[in-house]
């Protein structure tokens, strides 16, 4: 497919066409996913769980993220590569900049940071220095111990109000994209309308500008055996992985995925 850039993603939002994203950790799947038309490949710190077998993303290091980003780059055929900054890799803006540089040198086009309004200073510094940032809000797995587990965020009105304000603040600080995880569908829709940058959802309903899933989840592979509510197994009824990836792209584009049963209410 033609090379996907940040401008491409903003254009898709402007046209009302959904953006497709999947996690990806190696060259083989990068080639398969990009050939299927997946526009954004997320080198997620979820690799700590699905590849390394940890029970959280916390043990993943920046060096490991750079290694997998480089692998994805070698197989990619035109998708935009988004890489996660792992746990405690952005404790200060300066530390964040150094670690972002490592990931971008490995092949990332954009960096994803987990957090809320407190990230504004860091995002502003990164944006000023040429690092496009995707801010990850809602359920942020790196803070799972503070959140008390993997729970839907934003169900209480005060929390929802704060999340809306934080999204606007992060866009104003220079965030180029938002990712909302496990957020009530109605709240995700409101945030998507409140900002001009693309908003990607996972467990956030179908009114966001695009969708992302963990690659292994949508292929029916689960190390733990637990399948999140927002996941659909796209291998069902498909002859091969390439067909499953293409089915995911089609379902996101025609808004048949996610369906109502994949989302959360307030």
Curated annotation (Swiss-Prot):
Its EC number(s): 2.1.2.11
Pfam families: Pantoate_transf
Pathway membership: Cofactor biosynthesis; (R)-pantothenate biosynthesis; (R)-pantoate from 3-methyl-2-oxobutanoate: step 1/2
Keywords annotated in UniProt: Cytoplasm, Magnesium, Metal-binding, Pantothenate biosynthesis, Transferase
Active-site feature positions: 181
Domain of life, source organism: Bacteria
GO term, biological process aspect, one: pantothenate biosynthetic process
The protein's name: 3-methyl-2-oxobutanoate hydroxymethyltransferase
Natural source organism: Pseudomonas putida (strain W619)
């Amino acid at each position: 497919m033609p090379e996907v850039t940040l401008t491409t993603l903003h254009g898709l939002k402007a046209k009302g066409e959904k953006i497709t994203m999947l996690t990806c950790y190696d060259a083989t799947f990068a080639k398969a996913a990009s050939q299927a038309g997946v526009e954004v490949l997320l080198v997620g710190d979820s690799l700590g769980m699905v590849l390394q077998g940890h029970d959280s993303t916390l043990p993943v290091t920046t060096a490991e993220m750079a290694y997998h980003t480089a692998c994805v780059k070698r197989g990619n055929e035109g998708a935009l590569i988004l890489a996660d900054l792992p746990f405690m890799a952005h404790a200060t803006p300066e530390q964040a900049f150094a670690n972002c540089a490592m990931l971008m040198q490995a092949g990332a086009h954009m960096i994803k940071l987990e957090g809320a309004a407190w990230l504004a200073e860091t995002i502003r510094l990164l944006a000023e220095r040429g690092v496009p940032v995707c801010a990850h809000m809602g359920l942020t797995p790196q803070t799972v111990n503070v959140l008390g587990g993997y729970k839907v965020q934003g169900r209480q009105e005060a929390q929802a109000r704060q999340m809306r304000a934080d999204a606007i603040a992060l866009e104003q600080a220079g965030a180029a994209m938002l990712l909302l995880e496990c957020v009530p569908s109605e709240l995700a829709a409101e945030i998507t309308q409140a900002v001009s940058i693309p908003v990607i959802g996972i467990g956030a309903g179908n009114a966001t500008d695009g969708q992302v899933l963990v690659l292994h989840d949508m292929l029916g592979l689960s190390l733990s055996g637990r399948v999140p509510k927002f996941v659909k197994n796209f291998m069902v009824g498909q002859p091969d992985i390439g067909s499953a990836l293409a089915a995911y792209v089609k379902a996101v584009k025609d808004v048949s995925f996610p369906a109502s049963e994949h989302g959360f209410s307030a």
